[in-house]
Amino acid sequence: MMRIVSIASTAAGRRLAERLPYPVEVGGAAAAIRSAWHKVDAIVVFLAVGATVRLIAPHLQSKQSDPAVIAVDEAGTTAVVVVGGHHGGNQLATEIGALLGASPIITTATDRRDLPALDAIPGFAAEGDYRGVALRMLEG
């Protein structure tokens, strides 16, 4: 089971966050993200994508260790996968979409084309140029 936290800085964000089945941190998003970063598998932030990117940028290390991050707009109309799409973010955005009536915004190329993500196959340890292989898969 994924460890997930919602972070809301405004009353509108808090109202939406409380509709989700995850613990809610209310207040300063920067401090809440810093506190949660190494403790959870996913962070749902009720902020614009640009603000979310600026807040998570100092914490980003690798696809394998960073939590998935979903940015939900304060109207609750979109759930954008910012990072971690292949590591639970895409599924989480879809679940949030169903719970809030929001559109999940998934931009990972393999998911958009129903192809397997080589770096997300359970038990598969990628060696060598797996990105080149993935690119060739996408090119057909």
Please report, for each region that a protein language model flagged, where it lies by residue:
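Gly/Ser/Thr-rich loops at beta-strand to alpha-helix junctions
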Residues: 6-14, 47-54, 75-77, 84-90, ...
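General beta-strand structural signal in soluble alpha/beta enzymes
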Residues: 24-28, 44-47, 71-72, 104-108
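N-terminal basic/disordered segments at the start of proteins
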Residues: 1-27
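Short Gly/Thr/Asp-enriched flexible loops that form oxyanion-binding sites at enzyme active sites
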Residues: 55-65
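Internal alpha/beta core interface subdomains
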Residues: 87-140
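Short, acidic/small-residue loops that bind anionic groups at enzyme active sites
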Residues: 63-84, 92-107
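Short, structured active-site "lid" loops
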Residues: 32-53
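A short, well-structured beta->alpha microelement
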Residues: 21-35, 128-135
